[in-house]
Amino acid sequence: MKPNIVLIMVDQMRGDCLGVNGNEFIETPNLDMMATEGYNFENAYTAVPSCIASRASILTGMSQKSHGRVGYEDGVSWNYENTIASEFSKAGYHTQCIGKMHVYPERNLCGFHNIMLHDGYLHFARNKEGKASTQIEQCDDYLKWFREKKGHNVDLIDIGLDCNSWVSRPWGYEENLHPTNWVVNESIDFLRRKDPSKPFFLKMSFVRPHSPLDPPKFYFDMYKDEDLPEPLMGDWANKEDEENRGKDINCVKGIINKKALKRAKAAYYGSITHIDHQIGRFLIALSEYGELNNTIFLFVSDHGDMMGDHNWFRKGIPYEGSSRVPFFIYDPGNLLKGKKGKVFDEVLELRDIMPTLLDFAHISIPDSVEGLSLKNLIEERNSTWRDYIHGEHSFGEDSNHYIVTKRDKFLWFSQRGEEQYFDLENDPKELTNLIDSEEYKERIDYLRKILIKELEGREEGYTDGNRLLKGHPVSTLKHIR
């Protein structure tokens, strides 16, 4: 039988928030084991660092220019012909998604045989004046289950935390009722009810560590008194907050109270460790069903979280905290016959997930897919690889584009004409902006020309073919509206 495939996806987890990736403060024993015994990719990025566009890349294997989502916009239909789930389904796999999809309409199967949905608190879905199909009671299976357990009056907002806020506190109910546990509950139940005559493709999609920052008390307490590192602060960062943006509990940039920021990081780390332990629980269950050694796992996040670095928060911007993600493959049965424990430095993007997993299952990759399969890299066959990724995000005054390679990164904020350049080999924390350095002028010109070429013909008018122009940012390109 073909291998089972499990795609484990978390939301808003930074690439540096794994012990195996050099973080000495966080405890991620199961994830560290999986990455250490598998194949770890240290230069994985999202081309559009927010939820919807990142998930479109994973779902379709396309670049953002092709799937059409270059910023954050709810309510735009998902009508892609070829998806990762549809290809597995057509190839005879039993397909299931549990947790976050963040598509529209919310109950769009997108090729899965079944979905058990929890997108978290979405302002768009909570619009009480909207269509019934977009109201959360109609499209959140976790909330239905939660109310069956605790009564019809309980809600996702009971502990008073917004879904984008830096405010944090422990989960207000029993640990086993947390959404993170629910994803694993339902994933284990899928092992019971799956078709035993077919291999399966399971997407386990956690809402955390995305806000609300509400891990169960045990996990919050693990970190709340620890001396966690201060946020990174580049020489280019705005050290002032004249407009008091940090007073906004949902701020994207600004300066917030140090105690509150320390609690936020404790809750963020706690949420990740909680996910780690629950993934450990799933591994135990999969072993009990006798399927562990016939299963290949891919672990990834949709994007990261600035968590106060350079006085920025959340995501949507090109800096490492927002754009770089954890990405590893775990193959306990050594079905891939590769050199396990290897760390790769090739530049990856989320569009590479679909062709990689289809390749693992010996399924044909549709012509619409623009990502690259990692199978040849893992098998150490001679293969060419991309030199860079073009990333972007429409974001009002902070709309941005970037070119990132394994050695450096060029950034352009289109609406204010600001450029930055970081030598990631020598400055992986992006502490020194070298845009005015004569030493790097030739390299910067080269990367700028790459960006101009990437943006040629785009409807926003970002270039005339010779230079970068301010343009008119949009969140969704016309061809998918």
UniProtKB/Swiss-Prot annotation:
Cofactor binding note of this UniProt entry: Binds 1 Ca(2+) ion per subunit.
Family: Belongs to the sulfatase family.
Alphabetically ordered keywords of this record: Calcium, Hydrolase, Metal-binding, Oxidation
Protein name: Arylsulfatase
Function: Has sulfatase activity toward para-nitrophenyl sulfate, which is increased in presence of calcium ion.
SUPFAM superfamilies noted in UniProt: Alkaline phosphatase-like (SSF53649)
Catalytic activity: an aryl sulfate + H2O = a phenol + sulfate + H(+)
Enzyme type, top EC level: hydrolase
PTM: The conversion to 3-oxoalanine (also known as C-formylglycine, FGly), of a serine or cysteine residue in prokaryotes and of a cysteine residue in eukaryotes, is critical for catalytic activity. This conversion can be carried out in vitro by AnSME under anaerobic conditions.
Residues annotated as the enzyme's active site: C51, H102
Modified sites of kind 3-oxoalanine (Cys): C51
Keyword Metal-binding: yes
Residues bound to Ca(2+): D11, Q12, C51, D302, H303
EC number: 3.1.6.1
